[in-house]
């Protein structure tokens, strides 16, 4: 079970939002590169970046901050990025800059064929982000709620080579209310693509529940406010997850 620190970028700063509300942003750092280095020093094995301005604008808006993060990371760990990725040219540029995996969100909902094109052009480098409120998929920086069900959409991507589905429960994001285990498990059981949980991670109980769900296809969780507010220590939490993964794997064997 991989705990993946999130670095959400707004106006060049590292922030955390509450339920995706851009007006409820807490600035945690004005130096994104230093924040990336901090999480690496805490044992991060992967980083999750989101260009929040880009998600609303439909194109990248924090490229200088992204580049400062990539410079700080070097080749130490993989970096994935979502927010405002709408065309193949942007994906190619990001991969050339050092991003390991792009996350297609709004474009995956509005134009699923774009995901197939991206997977064909850049195999092994594409994830899909499905963000939902009360089971309905949201787009455009969570500002619009569609009529799409998460599972129905996710199934469209099964045979195209998508690396993972990042499933975010918007109502829990930034609220420290616990991961929506039930919905995450339901999605993982319904599709063949690995699932990364997002939204609400708050304590070791969440980590234990996620580790139990690993055999169903839940491969990781995005860690946001919990590690920024020090409710969870990243190094200790990842160590605990590793121990649980080994424990439950032995039970399966």
Curated annotation (Swiss-Prot):
Statement: the UniProt record of this protein carries the keyword Cytoplasm: yes
Positions of the catalytic residues: 8, 131
Cellular location(s): Cytoplasm
Record flagged with keyword Amino-acid biosynthesis: yes
Primary localization: cytoplasm
UniProt KW keywords: Amino-acid biosynthesis, Cytoplasm, Histidine biosynthesis, Isomerase
InterPro entries, per the entry: Aldolase_TIM, His_biosynth, HisA_bact_arch, Isoase_HisA-like, Isoase_HisA-like_bact, RibuloseP-bd_barrel
EC number: 5.3.1.16
CC terms in the record's Gene Ontology section: cytoplasm
GO annotation terms (biological process): L-histidine biosynthetic process; L-tryptophan biosynthetic process
Pfam families in alphabetical order: His_biosynth
UniProt superkingdom: Bacteria
Pathway assigned to this chain's UniProt record: Amino-acid biosynthesis; L-histidine biosynthesis; L-histidine from 5-phospho-alpha-D-ribose 1-diphosphate: step 4/9
Disulfide bonds: none
GO MF: 1-(5-phosphoribosyl)-5-[(5-phosphoribosylamino)methylideneamino]imidazole-4-carboxamide isomerase activity
Catalytic activities: 1-(5-phospho-beta-D-ribosyl)-5-[(5-phospho-beta-D-ribosylamino)methylideneamino]imidazole-4-carboxamide = 5-[(5-phospho-1-deoxy-D-ribulos-1-ylimino)methylamino]-1-(5-phospho-beta-D-ribosyl)imidazole-4-carboxamide
Family membership: Belongs to the HisA/HisF family.
Designated name of the protein: 1-(5-phosphoribosyl)-5-[(5-phosphoribosylamino)methylideneamino] imidazole-4-carboxamide isomerase
Species in which this protein is naturally found: Polynucleobacter asymbioticus (strain DSM 18221 / CIP 109841 / QLW-P1DMWA-1) (Polynucleobacter necessarius subsp. asymbioticus)
